[in-house]
Amino acid sequence: MLMPMPEPDEAPVAALVNIAGGLAGGDRLSFTMTLDAQARATLCTAAAEKVYRSLGPDTDISNILTAGPEAALEWLPQETILFNGARLRRRMNVSLATDARLLATETIIFGRTAHQETFLNGHFSDHWRLWRDGKLLWADNFRLPDPPARVLDHPFGLNRHPAMATIVLAATDAAAYRDLLREKWQDETGKGVTVPRPGLLLGRLIGSATAVRQGVEEAMIILRTHAMHGPARLPRLWLS
């Protein structure tokens, strides 16, 4: 992890860097971070993460985040690209104090779309648990079996779209920002936002890798500005 100098109006930035260039089958990656009371931080990656084809074992990623009272945490990595044959198991566990705020995004691209690669074989599971004051606020499990075509190609799955993203805002006033995103995305398919319970806003996107990234960037700018009280722009690492 590197700590580049933030812009004058930004929170401290932590850059998560994989010096190996990617993850292979059998690799295990664990990250833990705690923000104390009233602290602010933005966590980003400097580039897309790559998960290579596996010869059998899963790649395992575990992220554990904790935010104390009045803390504001942004988890904003760039895309994770699953090469054909990759096997990724990922877990995210976030614990928030009563008035802590969280903005989190995760984007998955199935196959190296720039090389016209299709994700024909492989496995992906994504496990989210979000806690507020020790009580479960949100739980989500996504599992893509091997072979993945029956989910990726199905009309009630990804409908042959190669990319998907999740956006999470946990804040006491989360519902106030739903209509801002709906207005931004009102003429677009494959993008939706909802408030499943008080204090939680969820966005879901599917589409091409380019369209999904554009939608995530739009949401990040809106939510960083209005919900996280930050600058009206993307993190600098997203632009480098």
Curated annotation (Swiss-Prot):
This is Urease accessory protein UreD. It is found in: Cytoplasm. Keywords: Chaperone, Cytoplasm, Nickel insertion. The keyword Repeat does not apply. It comes from the Bacteria. It comes from Granulibacter bethesdensis (strain ATCC BAA-1260 / CGDNIH1). Belongs to the UreD family. UreD, UreF and UreG form a complex that acts as a GTP-hydrolysis-dependent molecular chaperone, activating the urease apoprotein by helping to assemble the nickel containing metallocenter of UreC. The UreE protein probably delivers the nickel. Required for maturation of urease via the functional incorporation of the urease nickel metallocenter. GO terms for molecular function: nickel cation binding. Pfam families: UreD. Its main location: cytoplasm. GO terms for cellular component: cytoplasm. The gene is ureD.
